[in-house]
Each structure stands twice: as C-alpha cells, then as structure tokens.
C-alpha cells in the first residue's frame, strides 16, 4: 500500500489515518489513568508507570503484528531482557491469571477488556505453542 500525503499548507502534511496507530498508547493511557488496576505484568514484575512498556506478544520479526491484540503491558526492563526470546520463558502463571482477571473487568470508552482478551489470548497461546 502506498501512502500519499495530503499537503494542506507549506508547513503541514496530513497523512491518512493508520488503523493500528495508537493501540500501544491505549493500553498505556488506560493504565496510567488508573482504569487498568494491574499491579504486575504477566511475568510477575511490578508495573511502575515510570518503567512501563508495551510488549509484542509475538515479536514482529516472527510474524507478530502491530495491533492491540498482540500487545501486553510489561515492565520495560523485562521487555528489553526478553527481546526476541520466547514469551513462555518469562511468564509467571499466577501473574498471567491476575492479568486476565483484571482485563475481564476493564470497560472504558477506549478499551473493552473482554474484546482485548478475545484477540490477545489466541496470540499468547500461539506464541507459547510455537516458541515465539
């Protein structure tokens, strides 16, 4: 797909909307606003707003997409340590269950936790099964 910018004035360039843009921001925004009351990420590490990142469940270089359903909130140090290593090496089962239980109860204007889990869990299971 070729993206053609629209030049509305010499100083500005408007690009067509990107349907995937901002999904990382939605998870972060909702967490930082206190609407996702998670204490830990799926690896068992405490979520600190200062060190908050969004992890690709299936890394992009292994076929993962840049979409909400391939993202999870994660401590930035753990995310950097994980890199492209398989997610199952990092998952803490108790924390994963807590992540799911919290997300089941998230319902905001921008994020429906049930809808998120319906898309995210299949990606997580695929990543674990295929060693991604």
Predicted regions and their residues:
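A detector for short metal-coordination/catalytic motifs
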Residues: 26, 69-72, 76-132
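Histidine-centered nuclease catalytic patch
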Residues: 42-73, 82-87
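Generic structural signal for alpha-helix starts
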Residues: 18-26, 48, 59, 108
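Short aromatic/hydrophobic-glycine micro-motifs
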Residues: 36-37, 45, 106, 114
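Short, charged surface segments at domain edges that flank catalytic/cofactor-binding sites
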Residues: 1-42
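Intrinsically disordered, low-complexity segments enriched in small/polar residues
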Residues: 20, 32, 42, 61-62, ...
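N-terminal hydrophobic or amphipathic segments with adjacent small-residue motifs
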Residues: 28, 38, 57-58, 77
């Amino acid at each position: 797909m070729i993206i053609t910018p629209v030049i509305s004035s010499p100083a500005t360039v408007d690009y067509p909307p990107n349907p995937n843009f901002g999904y990382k921001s939605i998870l972060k925004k909702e967490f930082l606003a206190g609407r996702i009351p998670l204490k830990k990420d799926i690896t068992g590490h405490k979520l600190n707003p200062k060190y908050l990142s969004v992890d690709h469940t299936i890394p992009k270089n292994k076929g993962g997409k840049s979409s909400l359903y391939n993202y999870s909130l994660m401590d930035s140090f753990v995310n950097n340590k994980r890199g492209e290593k398989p997610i199952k090496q990092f998952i803490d089962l108790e924390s994963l269950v807590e992540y799911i239980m919290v997300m089941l109860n998230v319902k905001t204007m921008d994020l429906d936790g049930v809808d998120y889990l319906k898309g995210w869990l299949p990606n997580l299971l695929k990543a674990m099964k295929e060693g991604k």
